[in-house]
């Protein structure tokens, strides 16, 4: 199935992440630690931990760092004071935004998130105000040049839900959150190393924006992602390749 890449924003985000590797690693370690605390340190019995580990490895985190984070979480440590919170709101142009956080101080976090929304021309909403527009799923992305038929065979056999080949030759493999790690591990075992892999929220209907509003939305996303307590930010914007090129 061919189409325009719905995931062009991943390449933009990846470039930013390379420049902020330390902060990204901090967020990944926090996710691994909390996942291990909540579900135990055995990744085979803890799907969330397996997904967190897969994402960490996709971002080139070392095995030693991952193992230390697991031990920290499974042993209790100070991660017990951290809780997960989710905020929903609207950005410029009325776009839907979901912000996942991990915090030891809800009041601090909600204040910072609200300030980011307000500063960027958006507003923080109530629980459930936009979440219904999204579906949680895994996505494993490959740069152009991979063997599409071989990749498809491995992915589908491992439990992938859908595979999309884009006009530039890049490929996205979609999974349920539960099957994400199984599919990624099966692909790696067969020599298919992804360009990006994550469990994300995908909007059922995408918002089409002009460049002016898109720039304002990206500024909001950047503000939110720069907050220490923020783990992930999701939007329903259709970041097409053309739009991302205009955004630079």
From Swiss-Prot:
Q: Does the keyword Hydrolase apply?
A: no
The UniProt keywords, alphabetically, are: Cytoplasm, DNA-binding, Transcription, Transcription regulation
Write out the annotated subcellular location.
Cytoplasm
Name the GO cellular-component terms.
cytosol
Q: Name one GO biological process term.
A: regulation of DNA-templated transcription
- InterPro entries from the UniProt entry: Integrase-like_N (IPR017856), TACO1_YebC-like_2nd/3rd_dom (IPR048300), TACO1_YebC_N (IPR049083), Transcrip_reg_TACO1-like (IPR002876), Transcrip_reg_TACO1-like_dom3 (IPR026564), YebC-like (IPR029072)
Per UniProt, what is one Pfam family of this protein? Answer: TACO1_YebC_N
Gene Ontology MF terms in the entry: DNA binding
Q: Which domain of life is it from?
A: Bacteria
Q: Which PANTHER family match?
A: TRANSCRIPTIONAL REGULATORY PROTEIN YEBC-RELATED, TRANSLATIONAL ACTIVATOR OF CYTOCHROME C OXIDASE 1
The family assignment reads:
Belongs to the TACO1 family.
Put simply, this protein is called Probable transcriptional regulatory protein Fphi_1565
């Amino acid at each position: 199935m061919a189409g325009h890449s719905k995931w062009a924003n991943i390449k933009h985000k990846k470039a930013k992440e390379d420049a902020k590797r330390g902060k990204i690693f901090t967020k990944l370690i926090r996710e691994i630690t909390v996942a291990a605390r909540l579900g135990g340190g055995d990744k085979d019995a803890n799907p969330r931990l397996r997904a967190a580990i897969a994402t960490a490895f996709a971002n080139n985190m070392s095995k030693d760092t991952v193992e230390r984070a697991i031990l920290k979480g499974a042993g209790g440590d100070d991660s017990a004071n951290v809780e997960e919170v989710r905020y929903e709101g609207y950005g410029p142009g009325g776009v839907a935004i979901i912000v996942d956080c991990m915090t030891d101080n809800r009041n601090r976090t909600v204040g910072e998130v609200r300030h980011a929304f307000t500063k960027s021309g958006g507003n923080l909403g109530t629980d459930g105000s936009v979440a219904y527009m999204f579906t949680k799923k895994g996505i494993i992305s490959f740069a152009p040049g991979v063997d599409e038929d071989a990749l498809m065979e491995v992915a589908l056999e491992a439990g992938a839900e859908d595979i999309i080949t884009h006009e530039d030759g890049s490929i996205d493999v979609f999974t349920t959150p539960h099957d994400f790690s199984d599919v990624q591990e099966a692909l790696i075992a067969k020599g298919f190393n992804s360009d990006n892999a994550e469990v994300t929220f995908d909007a059922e209907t995408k918002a089409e924006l002009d460049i002016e509003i898109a720039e304002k939305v990206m500024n909001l996303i950047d503000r939110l992602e720069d907050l220490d307590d923020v783990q992930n930010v999701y939007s329903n914007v259709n970041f097409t390749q053309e739009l991302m090129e205009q955004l630079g």
